[in-house]
Each structure stands twice: as structure tokens, then as C-alpha cells.
């Protein structure tokens, strides 16, 4: 089971994702450096969680649309 992200992590991650969508990749290390440059994070743990959340969103966005269409067909 994975960890649940707090509201603050999600809010900050969503804002960074919307503002810097063109710079975000599916590579965690690159996203971690981006978060370090963009946000003045008070701890390494929070920075890493934000970077992980952004990476996960980027991977979800890069998934093919066909997968979601198949899921919709199964639900009907």
C-alpha cells in the first residue's frame, strides 16, 4: 500500500504541475531539481514528496487514452 499525500503536498504539486507543465518529465530526479528551484521547501522529505506527486501526475498524463476508454466500456 502506498502513502496518502497530504492536502498541502497535493495543492503545491498541482500548482507546480500547472505552471511548469512543459518542464515536468516522468523522471523523478529531474522533477526533484525543478521543485528545489521553484519552491523554498523547508525539508528534504517534503520536497521529495512533492516531486514524487508531480512525477506520478506526469506518468498518469502520459498514459494512452485507450486505457481509460476501455475502462469506460467495462463500466457500462
Swiss-Prot record:
PROSITE patterns, sorted: RIBOSOMAL_S17E (PS00712)
HAMAP family, per the entry: Ribosomal_eS17
Keyword flag Ribonucleoprotein: yes
Native organism: Metallosphaera sedula (strain ATCC 51363 / DSM 5348 / JCM 9185 / NBRC 15509 / TH2)
Any one GO molecular-function label of the UniProt entry: structural constituent of ribosome
Family: Belongs to the eukaryotic ribosomal protein eS17 family.
The protein's name: Small ribosomal subunit protein eS17
Matches recorded under Pfam families: Ribosomal_S17e (PF00833)
NCBIfam families on file: PRK01151.1 (NF002242)
InterPro entries: Ribosomal_eS17, Ribosomal_eS17_CS, Ribosomal_eS17_sf
GO annotation (BP), single: translation
Keyword terms of this UniProt record: Ribonucleoprotein, Ribosomal protein
Ribonucleoprotein recorded as keyword: yes
Gene Ontology terms: cellular component: cytosol; ribonucleoprotein complex; ribosome
Matching SUPFAM superfamilies: Rps17e-like
Residue stretches in coiled coil: none
Domain of life: Archaea
Amino acid at each position: 500500500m502506498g502513502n496518502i499525500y497530504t492536502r498541502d503536498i497535493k495543492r503545491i504539486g498541482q500548482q507546480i504541475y500547472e505552471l511548469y507543465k512543459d518542464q515536468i518529465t516522468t523522471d523523478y530526479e529531474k522533477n526533484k531539481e525543478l521543485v528545489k528551484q521553484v519552491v523554498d521547501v523547508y525539508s528534504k522529505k517534503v520536497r521529495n514528496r512533492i516531486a514524487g506527486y508531480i512525477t506520478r501526475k506526469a506518468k498518469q498524463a502520459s498514459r494512452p487514452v485507450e486505457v481509460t476508454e476501455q475502462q469506460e466500456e467495462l463500466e457500462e
